[in-house]
């Protein structure tokens, strides 16, 4: 009846009675014994630990690629290509407008079209970059949320683990509690790969696959055993003496900030920390150095420090996709800068050997935040405000001596 009642319970393992021969009765002085039948010696779960292991390994892989798919699908939606409203169409319209201007250089309406098409292209590049930037920030926020969720799961696992141990010591078979623990393990494995080591009295020691081998487990089967927890890096600040101050939230809780100063961090390691955002700390949220020593809040620690870089799970997916999004942002920057430098060179005549005085010609593209031409990016590219207000400033002549109808430069 217990199996039937829990047929729809998530994570429930079917239970069966383990039956063995009951103790026979000895017939005193007479030879032989009389059997007394059978008895139930235990109620056991029907569960395959090898399948559990395989499922959790694949759950971690699924978590990683599902997360990446989610974010990259959003990237696809941001670019919205191919479409009539994408960057490729706006770029084509931009060049088409200049092509028309080369034929009708004296037409004020054609010049206005050029400025409007240019503004549309710039706005689209700005918005696309900003959306990618926001998506990248969302992936970092996802890591922070996962850190908090993971620590919550670890606390629940610790509680259930202790309950199972106590029940097993007294001779009980805590099947339902073990189901609860397996459910939590399945949930944890979606975040990152885990290793589960069985201990006495049905206890489990739980660690992250390939991470923190010299540290305490994430869940310790010993009731008073030391554990390792995850904390989220909120900021990394470079100091004048070459050290770095790392601010982090204990267990991902924004109301529990702590800071440490780290010496010997290479630039590549700083970049890795900014991307992964996770530190391994003790159960109280204190930092652990590479030798396993505890460093209190406000203290100084020498590199190496214990970093958390999972290879699978949702956290790994959120970390890895940041690099993918960053790559698209860099490509946008290169395109915007290349376009701006090329058009400005042609527009100003600075690439022409027969033009000596270009001081009267405005840059066609500028940076909206006031940076010089070399600082133009997809985030700040803009049409020169003077040209937008007065399209007659668009330079279409081959040289200063050309007639008003000359549109060869356009």
What is each stretch, according to the model?
Residues 1-410:
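Structural signature of extracellular appendage/secretion-system components
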């Amino acid at each position: 009846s217990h199996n039937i009642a829990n047929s729809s319970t998530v994570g429930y393992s079917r239970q069966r009675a383990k039956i063995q021969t009951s103790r026979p009765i000895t017939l005193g002085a007479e030879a032989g014994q009389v059997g007394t039948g059978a008895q139930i010696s235990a109620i056991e779960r029907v569960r395959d630990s090898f399948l559990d292991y395989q499922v959790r390994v694949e759950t971690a892989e699924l978590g990683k690629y599902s997360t990446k798919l989610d974010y990259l699908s959003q990237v696809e939606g941001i670019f919205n290509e191919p479409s009539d409203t994408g960057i490729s169409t706006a770029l084509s319209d931009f060049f088409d407008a200049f092509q028309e201007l080369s034929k009708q250089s004296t037409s004020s309406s054609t010049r206005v079209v050029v400025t409007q098409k240019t503004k549309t292209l710039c706005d689209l590049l700005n918005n696309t970059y900003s959306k990618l930037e926001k998506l990248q920030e969302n992936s970092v926020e996802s890591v922070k949320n996962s850190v908090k969720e993971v620590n919550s799961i670890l606390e629940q696992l610790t509680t259930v683990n202790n309950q199972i141990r106590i029940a097993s010591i007294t001779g009980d078979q805590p099947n339902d509690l073990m189901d609860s623990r397996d459910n939590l393990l399945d949930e944890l494995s979606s975040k990152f790969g885990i290793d589960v080591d069985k201990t006495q009295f049905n206890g489990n020691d739980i660690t992250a696959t390939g991470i923190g081998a010299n540290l305490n487990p994430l869940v310790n089967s010993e009731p008073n055993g030391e554990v390792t927890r995850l904390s989220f890096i909120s900021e990394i600040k470079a100091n004048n003496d070459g050290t770095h101050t790392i601010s982090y939230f204990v267990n991902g809780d924004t109301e529990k900030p702590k800071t440490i100063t780290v010496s010997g961090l290479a630039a590549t390691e700083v970049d890795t920390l900014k991307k992964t955002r996770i530190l391994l700390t003790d159960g109280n949220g204190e930092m652990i150095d590479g030798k396993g020593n505890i460093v209190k809040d406000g203290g100084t620690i020498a590199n190496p420090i214990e970093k958390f870089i999972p290879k699978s799970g949702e956290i790994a997916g959120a970390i890895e996709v940041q690099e993918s999004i960053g790559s698209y942002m860099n490509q946008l920057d290169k395109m915007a800068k290349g376009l701006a430098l090329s058009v400005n060179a042609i527009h100003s005549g600075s690439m022409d050997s027969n033009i000596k005085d270009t001081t009267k010609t405005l840059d066609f593209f500028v940076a909206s935040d006031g940076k010089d031409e070399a600082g133009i990016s997809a985030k700040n590219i803009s049409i020169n405000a003077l040209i937008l207000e007065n399209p007659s400033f668009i330079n279409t002549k081959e040289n200063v001596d050309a007639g008003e109808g000359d549109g060869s430069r356009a």
